C-alpha cells in the first residue's frame, strides 16, 4: 500500500491515482485507450493500472484540468526526486557551433528566456535532423553535473553515443557504462558492480523492457535508485512510447529529456494519446522554414496499370497491403523503366563520391532490384543495408555508391556521409514520422529527395496528397513530374540515342579506330 493519504499523488513524470477501481472514471480510461482491430476491443495505452495496489498511473504531462475534473483536488505533490549522485570534473571540448545549439542549450538548462525550465522536470527537445541533439544533450549533462542515463531505441546506437560522449567531453571509457542484458542489471542492483566512478549510463529500451518483464517494474525503480540517476534522456522519443510511459511511471528523477525530430506518432489514435501525454511538457522546435530547408523534393508520378485482380491481390482484410504491393510492383514493366531513368539521373547528376539511398519495402523486392542493377550497371557499387546482411557487416554497406534499404533498417539516427540523393522507389507510406525521417537522411545542401508515386492505386494517391503539405514546409522546393507511358518511352528513347551517340564518339577516336583495324586484319589473317 502507498504511504500517501491523498487520492492523487503527483511526481516528476507521473500522476498516480490511488485506491482506483476499473470503471471509476470512464472518461480517463477512454482517453487513454485505442481500439484493437484484430481482437475488436479497447486496450489501454499511455496509462497503467496496478491491480494489486489499486493504483492508476498517468503521464505527468496531462493537463491538470483533466485530473481535477475527474478525481477532485485532493492532491499530494511529491516535492523532491529520488536521491541522485552528483558528478564532477566533466569538461567540454567544443563550444556550440551555431545560434540554434546555443538556444537549445539555454532551453534545456533553464537560462534566459527559459527560466521556468529550471524548475521543470520534463522537457521536449524537438530539434530537426542535423541541428545537433546529441551535442545539446551532452552539454546539458555536463552543466547539470548529475549522474545520467541515456535510453536508446536501438542497441546499435549505444556505441554511437559512447563515441560522441568521449568526443565532446573529457570522459574516459571507464566513466561510461553500458547496461547490456538482464544479467547486467541484476549485478548493478545487487551491488556486484562498483558504480562510484560511473558518470554516464547507456541502456536500450529492449533491455529495460526485458528486465521489467522478468522481475517487474518495481525493480526498474530499484535500479534507478540504486544507481542514483539524476537525469534520464530518451533518444528518438517518438519511438517506444509505451516503454517510455512505463519507465516514467516507475522512476522519479530530477530531470527527464525527450529528444526527437518528430514528436508525433504515425497512427492517428496513438498520436492523440501521445500528444495528450506531453500536452503540458515544455518543448522547443527551432525549425526555420525560410533558412533550414536544404533538400529539394521531386515527385515522379507514373501508372503501373493494375488490373482489378491486382488491386484485390494487394489488399488484406484491413485494406491496402503495402508488402503485397511492394512485391507486385517488381513484376511490372514500368517499374524497371522508371528505374532505368533514375539510374541515368544518378550517373549524370550525383558526384563521383556521392551516394544514393533507395528505399524498397521488402527484402524480396530489394533482391530483385539489386540483381537488375548489377546486371545492367555492373560498374556501379551497390550495397544492401537491411536484414539480408549480417549485423556486423551492415555499416560497411554504407560505403557503396548506391544503397538499397527499408525504412525499418535505415531508421532514425542513421547518418550516411556523402549522401546526395534519397529515392523512395518502392515503399509506400503516409506516416509523417517516416516522411520526416526519410527526408532527413540527406544532411548537406543542394541534395534531392525523389518520391516515386504509382497513381494506379487510389490509396497511393491519397498517401501522396497527405504528405504534400509537409514537403512544402521542409523542402527547398517541390517539383511534380507526371510521366505517362508515352513520356516514359520517349525518355527511354532519348537515353538510348544518347548512349549510341557516346558509343559512336568513342569508336570514332583515332587510336581506337586503329586498334579496331588491326584486330580486323588479324582476324582476316587467321
Give residue spans per PLM region.
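Walker A/P-loop
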Residues: 116-140
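Conserved two-lobed SF2 helicase motor
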Residues: 195-214, 397-412
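A conserved SF2-helicase RecA2
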Residues: 278, 282-288, 444-505
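Conserved interdomain linker/interface between the two RecA-like ATPase lobes of SF2 helicase motors
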Residues: 283-356
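Conserved RecA-like P-loop NTPase helicase motor core
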Residues: 387-470
Amino acid at each position: 500500500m502507498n504511504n500517501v493519504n491523498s487520492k492523487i499523488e503527483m511526481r516528476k513524470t507521473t500522476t498516480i491515482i490511488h485506491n482506483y477501481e476499473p470503471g471509476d472514471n470512464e472518461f480517463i480510461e477512454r482517453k487513454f485507450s485505442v481500439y484493437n482491430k484484430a481482437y475488436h476491443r479497447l486496450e489501454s495505452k499511455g496509462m497503467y493500472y496496478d491491480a494489486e495496489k489499486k493504483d492508476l498511473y498517468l503521464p505527468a504531462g496531462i493537463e491538470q484540468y483533466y485530473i481535477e475534473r475527474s478525481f477532485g483536488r485532493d492532491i499530494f505533490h511529491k516535492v523532491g526526486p529520488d536521491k541522485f549522485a552528483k558528478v564532477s570534473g566533466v569538461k567540454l571540448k567544443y563550444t556550440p557551433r551555431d545560434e540554434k545549439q546555443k538556444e537549445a542549450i539555454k532551453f534545456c538548462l533553464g537560462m534566459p528566456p527559459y527560466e521556468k525550465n529550471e524548475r521543470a522536470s520534463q522537457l521536449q527537445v524537438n530539434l530537426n535532423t542535423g541541428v545537433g541533439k546529441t551535442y545539446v544533450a551532452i552539454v546539458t549533462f555536463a552543466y547539470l553535473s548529475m549522474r545520467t542515463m541515456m535510453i536508446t531505441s536501438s542497441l546499435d546506437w549505444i556505441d554511437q553515443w559512447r563515441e560522441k560522449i568521449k568526443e565532446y567531453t573529457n570522459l574516459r571509457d571507464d566513466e561510461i557504462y553500458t547496461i547490456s542484458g538482464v544479467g547486467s542489471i541484476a549485478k548493478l542492483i545487487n551491488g556486484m558492480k562498483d558504480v562510484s566512478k560511473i558518470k554516464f549510463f547507456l541502456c536500450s529500451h529492449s533491455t529495460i523492457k526485458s528486465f521489467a518483464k522478468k522481475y517487474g517494474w518495481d525493480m526498474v525503480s530499484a535500479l534507478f535508485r540504486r544507481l542514483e540517476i539524476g537525469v534520464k534522456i530518451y533518444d528518438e522519443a517518438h519511438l517506444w512510447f509505451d516503454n517510455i510511459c512505463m519507465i516514467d511511471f516507475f522512476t522519479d528523477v530530477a530531470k527527464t529529456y525527450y529528444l526527437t525530430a518528430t514528436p508525433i506518432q504515425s497512427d492517428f489514435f496513438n498520436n492523440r494519446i501521445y500528444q495528450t501525454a506531453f500536452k503540458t511538457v515544455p518543448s522547443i522546435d527551432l525549425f526555420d522554414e525560410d533558412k533550414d530547408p536544404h533538400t529539394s523534393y521531386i515527385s515522379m508520378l507514373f501508372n503501373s496499370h493494375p488490373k482489378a485482380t491486382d488491386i484485390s491481390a494487394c489488399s488484406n482484410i484491413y485494406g491496402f497491403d503495402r508488402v503485397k504491393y511492394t512485391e507486385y510492383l517488381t513484376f511490372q514493366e514500368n517499374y524497371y523503366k522508371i528505374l532505368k531513368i533514375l539510374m541515368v539521373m544518378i550517373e549524370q547528376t550525383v558526384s563521383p563520391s556521392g551516394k544514393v539511398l533507395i528505399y524498397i519495402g521488402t527484402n524480396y523486392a530489394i533482391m530483385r532490384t539489386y540483381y537488375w542493377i548489377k546486371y545492367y550497371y555492373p560498374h556501379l557499387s551497390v550495397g544492401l543495408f537491411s536484414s539480408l546482411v549480417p549485423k556486423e557487416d551492415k555499416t560497411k554497406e554504407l560505403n557503396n555508391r548506391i544503397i538499397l534499404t527499408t525504412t525499418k533498417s535505415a531508421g532514425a539516427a542513421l547518418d550516411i556521409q556523402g549522401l546526395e540523393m534519397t529515392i523512395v522507389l518502392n515503399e509506400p507510406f503516409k506516416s509523417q514520422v517516416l516522411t520526416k525521417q526519410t527526408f532527413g537522411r540527406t544532411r548537406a545542401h543542394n541534395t534531392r529527395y525523389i518520391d516515386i508515386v504509382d497513381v494506379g492505386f487510389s490509396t497511393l494517391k491519397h498517401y501522396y496528397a497527405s504528405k504534400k503539405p509537409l514537403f512544402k514546409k521542409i523542402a527547398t522546393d517541390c517539383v511534380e513530374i507526371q510521366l505517362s507511358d508515352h513520356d516514359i518511352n520517349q525518355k527511354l528513347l532519348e537515353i538510348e540515342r544518347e548512349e549510341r551517340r557516346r558509343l559512336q564518339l568513342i569508336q570514332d577516336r583515332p587510336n581506337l579506330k586503329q586498334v579496331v583495324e588491326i584486330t580486323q586484319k588479324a582476324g582476316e589473317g587467321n
